[in-house]
């Protein structure tokens, strides 16, 4: 959500810190918080003023009218405060319909004052600007401030100066206090703006001869502005409404939501409830809650929540297991119901999200069966058949009753089934995959009926008509938006519309091109892309079977200059970049329509976008939207989902019904409903779920009224805001004459005892007129076709449509089959429709899932088991979990081979390169390239040579004699410096460890016998570190129990031992590189006196 209430303590803390005014604000930071856990001694130590002043005490839990409810203790001593708190602190209280525990109180100094010194101040945000309310009589009995207070609208980007305050607001204020009040209100407004408040009320504001006192304060801030205000806000805590506890599970899901690009919401209404929901989509989640409440389940509804925006399988698993753990804590005598619902997704891979839910169901199958949970599933969208299949299968394998339905079933029908209001049908067979668009259109299961009921000639004529201006016939009491133009285009999109896409959204662009192709457009609708984080280049896409290139520009100016035909920009920028990029876009006169996909743009910034768009005559769709679609012409981004849904919902050609919705998921649901009950969609727009969408319901309804091809209009309204009343006024004034079907979702809100913020930021009623129930009633009285519930929406649409057909308003026309579009390889592979041999194979590592896996072991387990470098090397090199002593031995080998000074060839090369100014990788590589038979390769050779001698059965003396006879050196024997009298401590350490920990050391024993023979001839012919590592490694592989003899021999043959030296010595080489850089050594040139110049004599003469 966007606007969130904060506690009075938080509001005052921010006010005292950041308000800038010449008025003397008294009692700054004088407040103390008391909870059931408060240590009074510590509290008095932190706030010594509690002992010296009379006090006021009140609960700080978002309770309105505390004074009227007797919840304020006034003019008390500290003992009086304690006595007052005793029967209240931690006790249950009822406020209106809500019952909750009083557990957070605020103590402040008592301010003696008269009634004449009490004032009322309030600032709140609207679409047009911020209203400032002032009343000269504040306090408990202030009454209806909307009717009594002086009111001043401060427009977007306008400033409030003290003179305007005195002139418009302080009309009835005492003369001697006007200057102080004007300064304070001016500072308060600047503070409100700077810290992104959406609501700020002080009642009473007391002004005495000593200064200004802020007694009671209520406030909301725009939570989406956190990235702007974090430094000033700090870590704000958003308390739940009174009557609803704050649960750790809600905090856990909120934390998941904050870390994810997807949306994850959870509100617990009644943890003991019988009906639980897990719904995909902000709009759909409201519709399901409405339907449950309409069917009498309000007291049994346990939670409200939603997941959307393509969460990963792991995120969905975490969300699902949280809900399943909550619902399996307390039994219900009638068992429990879990509704896994959702509209038809636009871009979320349903199979991926359902696999996360299925994992959670498997993990909780025992408790689910114990609590007699029945699950009802309904979903549509990309790959939904696979999702429904895995959901059905888990029901069969676990024995949990799971009823699964797809798009053939009305979205909310499963609620009626779950609550026993309608029978559970035998499930119709569903397709095995989402590949209908592979088939010839005439034989496809998604092909519409052979006749339709709209005139193609009429629609086509309208598409190429010049843009018209909307008539400015708005209700008189609405605030007009300043516009430099007379109006905005009636026609936003045509078959020739060209767009620029901001953001590297290749999947969305490909979806748009496939839609263009299936609509038989002559050219792709995407002319270019803009992405500031890469240089100019071209991106490859498919146009039917052909490959085409679309330019990608770093700068928007270049894209606009090279594509003057573009008049639409689709903005996929993140919430942090969307405002700036949209503002930049509006500097180009060619752009007439902008779609802003991002969710989470602060409302104050959105209002600035709206103001500039109105001045420029630009239509904004969004923010927080999937976009819109005009069948046969153009679609924005991911709207309408994949091609199979485009075909199933007949979105490849225009129908006669236009719709406008807030929700992206519900707009796709409307596509489905309208295609099943009428001849199809003419145009559909999702204006977005924010409180201030760039364009409103009325903007689009007026366009549809003025568009000849549109015969009827469908509006899916929502709780929050008053836009739907403009439709009522439009009908009464005769501006709207076409039949309109409308339903406002969110009717359940009036049935809840405490306020619930739904999935959309704007879905919250701030007054009675903003409730869905009030709006539906007003629409019905105005003559709009309003169903009794969302369940009946399709029936009403069909009834109105059939009347239009019967009256000849819509004339039947022949269906035209769309062209066949091939499926993307990656999607076909995911659906299991195709296979091909892989170019590469790997058996050691898998990075594709939620966490990295080494040879079958998740990375979390690697750390949990403290496997260390040796354990990881065992997994990656040998695909084995080696014994602890083996892991330690490998690490010891890496330690002793890490370096052997700067004089050896590898280190020398590394140093030379480093001093030549080369980078780390180049220097390291030059050192590694010296490793071979003469340097470092002795590990492999020694292991092979000693193994062969040992396995052949010859005794050590025979082996030494044989090598001498053949004139070969024994690899691993001999050292330039070390000898039997000056032993190599590296060898000694390893030898002692191996003998102490290895179960058997036959090859090491053999090598030591060889050493006795060789050192008897020459003391430096010892078993060196290469030789010891080589023979000990063979002993480890053969005798640790993890390998067969064949596997052990194979690892020696393929050079595993050489890897030990390469890996170990790399550490040393890197050390030498860093050392040279740190010492700032210059280019090395070898001295002449260290080089023997041996030239041919006849040349030197």
From Swiss-Prot:
Mark out the compositionally biased spans (Low complexity): 441-457
Q: EC number(s) of the enzyme?
A: 2.3.3.8
- One Gene Ontology biological process: oxaloacetate metabolic process
What GO cellular component term, any one, is given?
Answer: membrane
Residues that bear N6-acetyllysine: 540, 546, 554, 948, 968, 978, 1077
- MF-aspect GO terms: ATP binding; ATP citrate synthase activity; metal ion binding
> Which cysteines does the record link by disulfide bonds?
none
Region called Disordered, residue ranges: 441-487
**Residues bearing PTM Phosphotyrosine:** 131, 682
The annotated consequence of residue 554 to R/Q reads:
Decreased acetylation and increased de novo lipid synthesis. Abolished ubiquitination by the BCR(KLHL25) complex
What does this gene product do? Catalyzes the cleavage of citrate into oxaloacetate and acetyl-CoA, the latter serving as common substrate in multiple biochemical reactions in protein, carbohydrate and lipid metabolism.
- The identity of this protein, by name, is ATP-citrate synthase
Q: Source species, please?
A: Homo sapiens (Human)
